[in-house]
């Protein structure tokens, strides 16, 4: 078999930020506490970004001649009801306690609405279910998928407005003389209070009996920025939805993992709207992750699908992967969970098609962004933080520059990266990205990327970039200009508050 080579387009711009400095660079270090930004510490050692596979593809892995390659996924679990003891566990409505809800046929289960549910009985049953699906406590993800109702009253719009209507009816049954306005106010308070008790109580139970797992609810947080039909769609989360997320502070404080979703419909195929949609959903998740403790954010794992939700036979294109995976990685989250239903592997020729897609499209891009993110963390953040965009609206991505690297598949089916980073690659990181320090850690950005001598980053089955960079340019003050520079700097310092500096400043100049 011949060697298959990928020459990756560097989607969006890769700024050529290299070149010899023509001017003096004066680094004035302001107090650290004014500029620090945090992200959750990696949940796995030496793994800046975690890939999670949550697809029932056992048929594509076991007892097949050419299995799909899952070597880049650190956590693998099937969402099948029969699967237990996995590092990623997804609890649907029928797998965790006695979740009160109303099904599509309007049949009420366990009381139907939260106010009529039995919390004590629910928690007893939930404990049994957790112990069944997670028999031993070791590092893993525990995601509760309760989508029948939302804990925020106003978010239960059609068809979920049945929960509001039933709640109002409950109040009216207890007090027939009450007017509709007062009944609605009372119903809202009762519904939201009971919803909080069920969700908060379930999280506390899970954390108590399986504390090493990261507990949270699927689709939380959400910001409902999906009105794609409006003119000049900008992806921004509506202020009212951000305020509603603020009102769910009890949920964010109790969660040890956040699990938002950025699934795409086909209308967003290769679309700028998809970029903006994903961007601001992830940014809202980052904001929410800091509610409990800004210096110790909650880990964020973003759910994606490899197909369009309304056209499940069509896989995402490379541009779509950039709009989802690329956006998520560039903003500095903990990882990505790839989910899909059984049909992904059961469709006609499902496994061979999935295997080919992963081999030629998905896995090479995973290699691309993961190694770029690790290289940025190592060189810019000294491995004490992860890289995130300096500017929220930026289209900068953590990609390997195709003029420096190529990603190959060897005859043995293994991936390898050819090439080595150049100074311009590292300076691209420092120009467009900042260091978000890992929780409770002090990190300092590399001030001069030309000082980097070695790069050594790996992922998966020994897929690495190992390189020694060339000698640095010598920096010195140009003859005859030293006095002018010192005079200018002294003038600047004289007009600044005396206590602003806590670190030494550096003055670097190079010859043209």
From Swiss-Prot:
Transmembrane segments: none annotated. InterPro entries: Aldolase_TIM, Glycoside_hydrolase_SF, Hyaluronidase, Hyaluronidase_PH20/Hyal5. SUPFAM superfamilies: (Trans)glycosidases. It is a lipid-anchor; GPI-anchor. GO terms for biological process: carbohydrate metabolic process; cell adhesion; fusion of sperm to egg plasma membrane involved in single fertilization; hyaluronan catabolic process; single fertilization. Its EC number is 3.2.1.35. Residues 1-35 form the signal peptide. Glycans are attached at residues 63, 165, 179, 368, 408. One of its GO terms (cellular component) is acrosomal vesicle. The active site is at 147 (proton donor). Keywords: Cell adhesion, Cell membrane, Disulfide bond, Glycoprotein, Glycosidase, GPI-anchor, Hydrolase, Lipoprotein, Membrane, Signal. PANTHER family: HYALURONIDASE, HYALURONIDASE PH-20. Involved in sperm-egg adhesion. Upon fertilization sperm must first penetrate a layer of cumulus cells that surrounds the egg before reaching the zona pellucida. The cumulus cells are embedded in a matrix containing hyaluronic acid which is formed prior to ovulation. This protein aids in penetrating the layer of cumulus cells by digesting hyaluronic acid. This is Hyaluronidase PH-20.
